[in-house]
Amino acid sequence: MEEDLIKRLEAAVTRLEGISSNGGGVVSLSRGGDFSSAAGIDIASSDPSILAYEDLISQCVGRALTAAEKIGGPVLDVTKIVAEAFASQKELLVRIKQTQKPDLAGLAGFLKPLNDVTMKANAMTEGKRSDFFNHLKAACDSLSALAWIAFTGKDCGMSMPIAHVEESWQMAEFYNNKVLVEYRNKDADHVEWAKALKELYLPGLREYVKSHYPLGPVWNASGKPASAPAKGPPGAPAPPPAPLFSAESSKPSSSSNQKQGMSAVFQQLSSGAVTSGLRKVTDDMKTKNRADRSGAVSAVEKETRTSKPAFSKTGPPKMELQMGRKWAVENQIGKKDLVISECDSKQSVYIYGCKDSVLQIQGKVNNITIDKCTKVGVVFTDVVAAFEIVNCNNVEVQCQGSAPTVSVDNTTGCQLYLNKDSLETAITTAKSSEINVMVPGATPDGDWVEHALPQQYNHVFTEGKFETTPVSHSGA
């Protein structure tokens, strides 16, 4: 009896393997994912790590989807992509248990399904800026946390899986906090969505990785070689954004290309048929500032004045460590994914002339300075000395560790986020306005509390000296 049963099982497995090798029928799992082997069914139904991942999807991803359905529009669309990415990672986790560890080239092909999903989310943040841009960026940037599955060892260039999830969320949290601040008194559905997104990763994904894969995915040494999943009929290719698992940073945004395009338009106008029939206006044809009138500007003087450019040219983008002591981040335009990951407490960071960019500093540094920047966000961990903001407009700074001093000088518009470990930070301001400080709420789940620093003061001469107090305005 037992021998007959074994033979029937072997025959069934052989038929399933034949179907799989021919690209035929795919076995559908009731709890998600498609796999072309009977082993996939057993793993998905009994393996504790897969069951725990399914619970993560049903609980945490489900909560985010429920909140997104109340909002609708692009927020729901990008949340569905997040759900798709988690489902794709679950499928990869099942396949890893049946697959030998591949080389780097094979790993890229193996992880391509997950990478394709993250590229769809990235595409939603491009083009015309949406009213829900902060939602889209928070969701898109959060997906980089799923790259923990690409960890292959300490020398692979990635942080350990648990640390990678935490570090990846830091960049997403920058935009997630904006959602919380913007909608905290406007729409509870958006606040619920932002909280659900954070809890999906912290503690959700972090605790899952900590419990099941603290050292990365465990491949099957006796399994089959890794290969990319079978593809369907090819569709029309779309221009892809930067991949999730790329070792290089993404290319600059199209803002510089737009500027070059406008310059080309003006150059074409000045050299085309439109202006070919125009005649040069000589001095004797002028009715203003003619050379024969007193007080006229001489041609030599005029040429000297006009030869100087009205604005200084922007230098080339720069992001480098100089002399081993100073990180120089200069002239970065439209770069949302700048990261300094290797730094120490003896180094300083100087950010100059940047616009519409976000920089993340991972680790402790001596001091950080932002100079002449517009619409720049900086997320940092710890500084030993001070964080300085000088000659800036509309900057946002988030401290995730500690900072003894934050100095704001000659700046209009600064949003400063302090965490529970940096509430004793000393903040000094001079010749600045619109300085708002966000601090955590009284409870772990509480909303951020905004405090506007005073920019008007009342000076009264009393008992031989001036006493200065901030001016407070009470609403009617």
Swiss-Prot record:
Cross-referenced Gene3D superfamilies: 2.160.20.70, Adenylate cyclase-associated CAP, N-terminal domain (1.25.40.330)
Gene Ontology BP terms: actin cytoskeleton organization; unidimensional cell growth
Chain ranges passing through the membrane: none
Region described as Disordered: spans on this chain: 224-262, 277-319
Consequence of gene disruption: Stunted growth and reduced pollen germination and growth.
Signal peptide region: none
Tissue: Expressed in roots, cotyledons, leaves, stems, flowers, pollen and shoots. Not detected in siliques.
Bias (Pro residues): 231-243
Residue ranges with Low complexity bias: 246-256
Pfam families xref list: CAP_C, CAP_N, CAP_N-CM
This protein's UniProt keywords: Actin-binding
Compositional bias of kind Basic and acidic residues: 280-293
Gene Ontology molecular functions: actin binding
Domain C-CAP/cofactor C-like: 316-453
InterPro entries: Adenylate_cyclase-assoc_CAP (IPR001837), Adenylate_cyclase-assoc_CAP_C (IPR013912), Adenylate_cyclase-assoc_CAP_N (IPR013992), C-CAP_CF_C-like (IPR017901), CAP/MinC_C (IPR016098), CAP_C_sf (IPR036223), CAP_CS_N (IPR018106), CAP_N (IPR053950)
Family recorded in the similarity comment: Belongs to the CAP family.
Function: Actin monomer binding protein that accelerates the exchange of ADP for ATP. Regulates the pool of unpolymerized ATP-actin. Key intermediate between actin-depolymerizing factor (ADF)-mediated disassembly and the profilin-based nucleation and elongation machinery.
Domain notes: The C-terminal domain (318-476) binds to actin.
PANTHER family xref list: ADENYLYL CYCLASE-ASSOCIATED PROTEIN
Name of the featured protein: Cyclase-associated protein 1
Gene expressing this chain: CAP1
